[in-house]
């Protein structure tokens, strides 16, 4: 609703089901966002999930992002999540502001809206560049070989 009031219109796809779905559907209706919102539902087919993520311009994870960060970056989709890093899982470190996504102030919907708006203002027309940056982050730092070397360094005291 905040972004729509500013004349910014985005399509939203909710993938998954759960206890919040009815509340989300009510909020979508309240803010007259039905034409731009798709409740896909639960999906456990990796090929379908890959297509959904690959074709998304941005993943917004208002809660703890965890492995979702790895999943979406792996398919070239940047992510936005909250900045309360003590509550986050370690995977939040894959989000590099302005490159592979961004952060918004924890529990602040206005700042979330600003982060989304800022992302699209900065990255409009740069989808392939962003996709490649996401791939590179995963390939360079979030693969078994790199992680194994980090563990070895800890045990070797380096």
Regions found by a protein language model. Name each.
Residues 1-12, 17, 29-31:
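Short hydrophobic signal-anchor/transmembrane segments that target glycosyltransferases
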Residues 15, 22-43, 47, 55:
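Nucleotide-activated donor-binding/catalytic signature segment of Leloir-type glycosyltransferases, i.e.
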Residues 50, 68-77, 92-93:
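Short alpha-helical segment that forms part of, or immediately flanks, the ligand-binding pocket
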Residues 51-64, 77-78:
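Acidic donor-binding loop of glycosyltransferase active sites
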Residues 58, 76-85, 99-100:
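Structural loop-to-beta junction motif characteristic of Rossmann-like glycosyltransferase folds
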Residues 124-156:
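A charged, aromatic-enriched C-terminal amphipathic alpha-helix characteristic of glycosyltransferases
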């Amino acid at each position: 609703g905040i972004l729509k009031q500013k004349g910014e219109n985005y399509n939203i796809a909710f993938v998954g089901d759960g206890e919040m779905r009815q509340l989300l559907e009510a909020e979508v209706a309240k803010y007259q966002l039905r034409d731009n919102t798709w409740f896909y539902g639960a999906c456990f087919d990796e090929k379908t999930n890959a297509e959904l993520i690959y074709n998304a311009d941005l993943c917004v994870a208002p809660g703890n992002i965890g492995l979702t960060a790895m999943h979406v970056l792996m398919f070239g989709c940047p992510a936005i999540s909250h900045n309360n890093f003590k509550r986050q899982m370690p995977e939040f470190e894959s989000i590099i502001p302005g490159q592979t996504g961004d952060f918004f102030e924890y529990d602040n919907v206005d700042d979330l809206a600003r982060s989304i708006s800022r992302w699209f203002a900065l990255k409009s027309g740069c989808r392939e560049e962003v996709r490649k940056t996401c791939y590179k982050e995963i390939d360079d730092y979030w693969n078994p070989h790199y992680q194994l070397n980090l563990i070895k360094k800890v045990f070797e005291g380096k």
